[in-house]
């Protein structure tokens, strides 16, 4: 809202100038039940936040007092483009370390389906990133000039950029000296981290050991990047099917989709890394804003997809290329996942296009 030129302030339960509960009733989100506030679909299981602004908006009407229970037949069947209630029921029955998608049913293999000659793959410095090369003028003057005009192009996307940048200092930090002793089971640790990732908003999560070539060799200033972690927890963030299907291709909404996924990914990995550091395990969030590792090989080894022919992109069997990645590297003992084979290489090798 501020990027569009209007005043706007955020409010939550702990920090705000308004009665958010009352506003939620007036805005048609909740109804009062005595002293309690209920949502027709969520009951009491929600938190509230609000934005106040002078941006002129149409107002919603309060809900009828009879709207306390919205879980009728329409809810369970998903009428009105909502996720069906029966689908929520299915997800609730799955173990917490499993995603909403049945990734565990996909065929597992010992190595990624794209040939990787481990001893021949060189490490590259962060200066070799194409964004960095364009910025330095390696790709010509036009690319150097246009590098600064990134694909935000939308107030919604721009509003998330500052938050993404502000989380960078929190990606790494002090490790508490007293390591907790009851984290010696790699399998239990892996399940716990996956459960946390899904609670925080990851779509799918996999774990792998970090190969040598997945580490950048040097930072942009020339300093060496140490290989201080053994494991990578790799997470996919869905960019949104409905938004992608509704985009025209020239409305710049894809920039907002990217920034939202990057912002959420940085939050998820940042919280998880801080949690592990507080338990004595060195951990770091590796995000789009600052990463010491190359994500593509880690996504392959963590069993989250196969390398496609859409440029340098890993295709997931359930959400395709509609994803952004975030990684948390750590030394906590973890059980690793295997790469997957859902037939992509066979399909592409049979293509006549």
Where are the language model's segments positioned?
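Catalytic cores of enzyme domains
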Residues: 1-70, 194, 203-353
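Iron-sulfur (Fe-S) cluster-binding modules
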Residues: 65-208, 229
